C-alpha cells in the first residue's frame, strides 16, 4: 500500500523510524527517479514503525523541502527512575514517536544541559539508556517487535 519500503540501519543497529533518514530517502529516491510517487509531491513509506507519509516540494530535478507525517506518538511511561553513573538517580518520562525517547526534565541529578559538554551528554545519555533498558522493558503495545 506504500510507494517504498525502507529500513533504517545505523551504527547502533536497526531503528524502527528515523526522521533524518526518511527525509534523505525521499530526497534521493525522487531526485534519482528510483521511485515514482502515486501522487505528485507525496510519497508513502513502509517503515518498521508503520506507515510514514511524506510531502515534498521539488524545483526542477531537486527536492527542496520534505515534510513528514510520522506514526502516532504517545506517552509510554511516567516517572521512571534510573541510577546513572556520574549523575545519581534520574527520573524520566518515556515517549514513543517511532522510537522510544527518555524525556529528562531539570531535577536534582540533572539541572541543565549547559552544565555538561556535548561529549558528556553523549556519554550520560548512553548510560541513561542502558540503565533504563536494564530496569524496564519498552515494547510498543500494537507492534511488539518494536522495543
Language-model regions, residue ranges each:
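Active-site proximal loop and beta-alpha junction motif in alpha/beta enzyme cores
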Residues: 1-17, 22-147
Amino acid at each position: 500500500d506504500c510507494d517504498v519500503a525502507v529500513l533504517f540501519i545505523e551504527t547502533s543497529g536497526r531503528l524502527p523510524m528515523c526522521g533524518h533518514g526518511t527525509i534523505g530517502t525521499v530526497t534521493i529516491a525522487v531526485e534519482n527517479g528510483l521511485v515514482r510517487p502515486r501522487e505528485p509531491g507525496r510519497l508513502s513509506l513502509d517503515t518498521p514503525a508503520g506507515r510514514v507519509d511524506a510531502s515534498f516540494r521539488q524545483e526542477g530535478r531537486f527536492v527542496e523541502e520534505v515534510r513528514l507525517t510520522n506514526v502516532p506518538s504517545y506517552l509510554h511511561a511516567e516517572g521512571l527512575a534510573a541510577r546513572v553513573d556520574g549523575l545519581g538517580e534520574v527520573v524520566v518520562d518515556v515517549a514513543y514517536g517511532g522510537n522510544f525517547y527518555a524525556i529528562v526534565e531539570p531535577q536534582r541529578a540533572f539541572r541543565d544541559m549547559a552544565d555538561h559538554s556535548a561529549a558528556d551528554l553523549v556519554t550520560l545519555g548512553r548510560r541513561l539508556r542502558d540503565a533504563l533498558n536494564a530496569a524496564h522493558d519498552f515494547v510498543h503495545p500494537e507492534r511488539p517487535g518494536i522495543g
